[in-house]
UniProtKB/Swiss-Prot annotation:
It is found in: Secreted. The keyword Disulfide bond applies. It holds the Pfam family Toxin_2. Belongs to the short scorpion toxin superfamily. Potassium channel inhibitor family. Alpha-KTx 27 subfamily. Keywords: Disulfide bond, Secreted, Signal. Its main location: secreted. This is Potassium channel toxin alpha-KTx 27.1. InterPro entries: Scorpion_toxin-like_sf (IPR036574), Scorpion_toxinS_K_inh (IPR001947). Contains 4 disulfide bonds. Expressed by the venom gland.
Amino acid sequence: MKFLFLTLFVCCFIAVLVIPSEAQIDINVSCRYGSDCAEPCKRLKCLLPSKCINGKCTCYPSIKIKNCKVQTY
């Protein structure tokens, strides 16, 4: 039982280290709804889903984009 628990713990620890979390980027585009952000994110080659947070579009970067702030939510 201890071996099973230890194996599970090690697997979870490795998964946390190996699988990086990506932050959303603020693309400096105003919005009212999440659907307003789909086209600007697509134009900048970002990944969906895009979100409208506090009146600003955010999306996940697929490549490094210059002049974007990294936001953590």
